[in-house]
Amino acid sequence: MKKLITLLLMFSFGFIQAQDKLISANFKKSIQKGVTVVEFNAPFNSANSYSDYKKLTHCDYYKVCIAGSPELKKKYKVYSVPTIIIFHNGYVERKYKGNIMLELDVTTNELQKAVDELYLDKF
């Protein structure tokens, strides 16, 4: 019984975590409407993953693992991680690349400003 509960908890946690991850199959649909912020990263760089995404408003936020989606890495020319791309109605509007230390130089305020400019564009 203890093993069953442990497995159920692990499955539930994994499902919740996976909801914000994109793969090629669901990528296009997820970026089609409104402002979407997508972080491209790799398992070896998870320590430098963008952590303040919950502070962003007026946008959807997703993650793409480049190891699991090499075709997206190629299509969007992701050469360093992390890379954040802001889409507006399916089109690339802004791109922020990780530096030589595999860290993002963009601040949450800068990301929010870019999101707000695109979001307000609909009015």
Report residues per predicted region.
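Sec-dependent N-terminal signal peptides
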Residues: 4-13
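N-terminal leader/targeting and pre-domain segments
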Residues: 17-33, 110-123
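Local sequence-structure signature of Cys/Sec-based thiol-disulfide redox active-site neighborhoods
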Residues: 21-57
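Extracytoplasmic/secreted cell-surface and envelope-processing proteins
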Residues: 46-49, 72, 94-96
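Active-site regions of enzymes building and remodeling cell-envelope glycoconjugates
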Residues: 56-64
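N-terminal post-signal-peptidase region of extra-cytosolic proteins
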Residues: 66-71
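Structural micro-motif
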Residues: 76-88
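Non-catalytic, surface beta->alpha helical segment in thiol-disulfide oxidoreductase systems
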Residues: 86-123
